[in-house]
Amino acid sequence: MVKGRSKELKMCNLEKTAAFEYFVSKLVGLDLKKSPSVKELDVEKLNNKLSEYSMTRYMKLLYFFCLTDAKREIYNNRRRAELPEETDHNGGLLEIFNNFEAYLNGPVEVDIYENRLNKGMFSLFTFEDGRLELRKDEFLNRAQKVLDETSSAVQDAIDGAYSELENKKLKILPNGKSILEQDTTPLVEVAHNLSPNVWPACFYYNKEKGKISQLFKNERELLHSEIQKFESQLK
């Protein structure tokens, strides 16, 4: 974050927190909809998987999920323009994760990131030693709480973005891994090399006081540009 930028931390709302937990569960292969009991869970395996993810890695993937979903939303909105009577629709993941700011390592959803150390922030996870770990107590109730607080539209948006990205690879790396399997460093590199008018403008020149989400609201064409630059990084 640019030195001197005001930092107004607010508590993260339940819907956003639950959506983030659903997103994390999706990444590590924990299917909450199947509602497995603790006995059926391989907790050690899941925690080993969780240990591979820094919060920076989550933030970059979350941003890429939001861009992928926004591309779908733009397409759907164009179709709705042809069908004006169809007005009930979800605004997409960028309306849920609506507080991205430009940090040193790329876009960060501030409400999630800055509250991660708060006890009780997450239902399914604790945050220990820089990593999320699965809570073992009352797992079924906690899983159901996440599902109840994450709308079906948001679940579908996360599922859809996951399905689209799981077979996408990064052009900058020849290792053949899906973008979802890449480590933190290449994800940060991608985030730094999207539209020059988004993260660089917000981070280095304090555009919109570093608030990427606000930038997208005020200059919608920059969201389109960011999506196109992200798509150009994939194969």
Residue ranges and their predicted role:
Residues M1-K235:
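Domain-edge interaction signal
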